């Protein structure tokens, strides 16, 4: 062999020897010696404790799926046991994540193209604890060591990372959130066989079009949310789908908290950045008010409800997020509801906007909004209030609602919502239709401008203003009732079908207090009512359940059916006490004047009724009548002393020029002389 050949052989032999020695060293190297260095470096980079406390090892294996010369290149198969990741210094708990064992395979040839490629990684029984102490203090936000020293002009790294699959047998996530008062455990299990998105949602065409990933893991949740027990089940996509910006991440869940249920299925867009969601969303429960604790959206207390709609959300935690609940359908009590609502987060307050419609609205289902028993479902609504610490405070013997308006919550959001009710049900007969209102809530200032609805062939329009930012709340109501037909007000009463009369009215009230009773109890304002061409009888009073009216009509007119030409009332209200300027009835037999007071604060009546015969017919009553007692239990009787002199009632009414003129304004010009009240009030003005 020549000298050159010997040198070449020696170099080749030495090179092969080095390779063999390197392979032997790598194969027999105790990788546990690197644990202190790895633990220290990772802990410093993450700014929180990290440790591999168990065995760290590498096994080199050839990959059978590779072909050609690549099949001879061994791949490192790494395993590490008993891994812990701690919390930041300001989180009292020690451990955030614990992994009994992690395995992964690295593709070595990919390093030549500056790619770190892990074909798979397997996690054994991962256990994580997510903690949030305040809005800005949690353990899942990482403050990396070089975050503060990043060069804004630095070029991105030439290296890339690729992960093809994440496997694990069973995982557990514990959530301790002081903000939402959540203390939950979520158990994650592989489904065994991935479920196509379309099989769960029933939207095959849509799923294929959007290339939604399959459901891979099942979820079970238990614990407490906002102090209430919560349980639930669900499904989510694979972990790799989390990083796919173009692939929506599938989610499905069904949660229950008490009697409140929230169920949804759909997708999360750009899940690593939580860019938004597109879900079919269902709610149900004892009261819409219960959803405040779950969603942060302020809604009124109602009878039992359920809704089903589509939620499309665009989420931006830095600026504001938009949650669009589109085309929902459902019910509240026995009333159907439909519409779309948009909830926008942001400063100074989030805002709720949209349109809601009910084709058949049961008026009693609106009862809890104003503190009135809603009938069917009322018990569940009351239990919902008691669960929140809101006990019924209606005193015995009182009629006016005492339930308090929750003004302390009115400043949590603003609202601009329009509501329409096409057909209204109230009891068996009261004819109400076409209810509409524009609800505006801004900085705890609530307005219903306007509130309109049809009633008995006429209309009622109102502007309601409640200043919830004032202590106590200030309230104002301006109400107009026009051309309510008497026979339609009582369609089931045969007697009233004989009349063509109408009722008109105006009310202006101002008050303060946090309930209807309190507002009226110190209210100031005026109430005007005018009725023409009516009928009255003892039988009518009995039908409508007015025992006091039955007594009074019988005392004045006996058992006769009496035509009422005009009934007029102009009441001044001061400090919750109503005093009539005019309160009179002109009938075919008598002219009746009512004086006295009615107190909204004490709900006490103290009225005197003076009748005066008209024409030849003489009424038999020899003394005035009184009505005393409470709104709930009024008592009527005959006052001591004779009736006032004949003609005195008419003379007294004739002096009330200004109140009479105010009542004339209630008569529409189109009615002309057909309205008998016009003639009577015009005579009073002269």
Curated annotation (Swiss-Prot):
Which processes are annotated in GO (biological process)? Answer: regulation of protein targeting to membrane
Q: Which residues lie on this side of the membrane: Periplasmic?
A: 28-686
Provide one Gene Ontology cellular component: plasma membrane
Q: Which UniProt keywords apply?
A: Cell inner membrane, Cell membrane, Membrane, Transmembrane, Transmembrane helix
Q: Which residues constitute the signal peptide according to the record?
A: none
Q: Note the topology in the membrane.
A: Single-pass membrane protein
Q: Report the transmembrane regions from the record.
A: 7-27
Origin superkingdom: Bacteria
Please list the residue ranges that the record places on the Cytoplasmic side of the membrane. 1-6
Show the ranges annotated as biased composition (Basic and acidic residues): 376-391
Compartments where found: Cell inner membrane
**Stretches for region Disordered:** 372-396
The Swiss-Prot or TrEMBL record describes its family as follows: Belongs to the AsmA family.
Write the protein's name: AsmA family protein YhjG
Which organism is this protein's natural source? Escherichia coli (strain K12)
- Its gene name is yhjG
């Amino acid at each position: 062999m020549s000298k050159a050949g010997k040198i070449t052989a020696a170099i080749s032999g030495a090179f092969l020897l080095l390779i063999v020695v390197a392979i032997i060293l790598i194969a027999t190297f105790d990788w546990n010696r690197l644990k202190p260095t790895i633990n220290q470096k990772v802990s410093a980079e993450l700014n929180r404790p990290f440790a591999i406390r168990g065995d760290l090892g590498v096994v080199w294996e050839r990959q059978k799926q590779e072909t050609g010369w690549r099949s001879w290149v061994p791949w490192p198969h790494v395993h590490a046991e008993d891994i812990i990741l701690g919390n930041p210094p300001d989180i009292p708990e020690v451990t955030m994540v614990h992994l009994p064992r992690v395995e992964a395979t690295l593709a070595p040839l990919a390093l030549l193209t500056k790619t770190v490629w892990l074909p798979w990684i397997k996690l054994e029984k991962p256990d994580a604890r997510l903690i949030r102490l305040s809005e800005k203090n949690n353990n899942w936000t990482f403050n990396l060591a070089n975050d503060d020293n990043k060069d804004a002009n630095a070029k991105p790294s030439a290296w890339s990372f690729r992960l093809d699959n994440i496997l694990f047998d069973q995982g557990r996530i514990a959530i301790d959130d002081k903000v939402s008062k959540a203390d939950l455990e979520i158990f994650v299990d592989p489904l065994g066989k991935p479920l196509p998105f379309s099989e769960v949602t029933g939207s095959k065409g849509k799923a294929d079009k959007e290339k939604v990933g399959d459901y891979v893991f099942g979820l079970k949740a238990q614990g407490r949310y906002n102090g209430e027990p919560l349980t639930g089940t669900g499904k989510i996509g694979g972990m790799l789908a989390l990083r796919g910006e173009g692939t929506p991440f599938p989610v499905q869940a069904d949660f229950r908290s008490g009697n409140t249920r929230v169920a949804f299925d759909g997708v999360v867009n750009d899940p690593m950045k939580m860019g938004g969601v597109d879900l079919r969303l269902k709610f149900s429960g004892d009261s819409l008010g219960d959803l405040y604790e779950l969603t942060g959206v302020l809604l009124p207390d109602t009878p039992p409800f359920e809704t089903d709609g589509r939620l499309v959300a665009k989420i931006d935690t830095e600026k504001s997020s938009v949650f669009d609940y589109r085309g929902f359908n459902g019910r509240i009590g026995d009333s159907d509801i439909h519409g779309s609502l948009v909830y926008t987060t942001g400063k100074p307050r989030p805002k709720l906007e949209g349109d809601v419609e009910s084709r058949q609205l049961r008026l009693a289902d609106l009862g809890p909004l104003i503190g009135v028993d809603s009938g069917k479902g009322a018990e569940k609504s009351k239990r919902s209030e008691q669960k929140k610490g809101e006990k019924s405070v209606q005193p015995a013997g009182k009629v006016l609602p005492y339930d308090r308006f929750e003004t302390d919550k009115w400043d949590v959001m603003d609202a601009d919502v329009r509501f329409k009710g096409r057909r209204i049900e109230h009891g068996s007969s009261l004819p109400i239709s076409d209810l509409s209102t524009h609800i505006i809530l801004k900085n705890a200032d609530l307005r219903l401008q306007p509130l309109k609805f049809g009633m008995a062939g006429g209309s009622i329009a109102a502007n309601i203003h409640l200043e919830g930012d004032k202590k106590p709340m200030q309230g104002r109501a301006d109400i107009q009732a026009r051309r309510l037909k008497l026979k339609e007000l009582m369609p089931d009463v045969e007697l009233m079908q004989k009349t063509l009369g109408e009722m008109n009215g105006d009310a202006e009230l101002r008050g303060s207090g946090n309930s209807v009773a309190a507002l009226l109890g110190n209210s100031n304002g005026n109430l005007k009512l005018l009725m023409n061409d009516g009928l009255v009888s003892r039988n009518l009073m009995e039908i409508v359940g007015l025992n006091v009216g039955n007594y009074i009509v019988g005392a004045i007119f006996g058992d006769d059916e009496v035509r009422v030409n005009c009934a007029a009332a102009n009441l001044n209200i001061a400090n919750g006490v109503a005093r009539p300027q005019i309160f009179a009835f002109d009938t075919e037999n008598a002219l009746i004047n009512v004086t006295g007071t009615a107190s909204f604060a004490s709900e006490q009546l103290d009225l005197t009724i003076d009748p005066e015969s008209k024409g030849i017919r003489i009424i038999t009553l020899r003394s005035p009548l009184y009505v005393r007692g409470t709104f709930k239990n009024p008592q009527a009787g005959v006052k001591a002393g004779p009736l006032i002199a004949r003609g005195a009632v008419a003379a007294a009414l004739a002096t009330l020029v200004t109140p009479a003129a105010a009542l004339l304004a209630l008569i529409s010009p189109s009615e002309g002389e057909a309205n008998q009240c016009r003639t009577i009030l015009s005579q009073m003005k002269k």
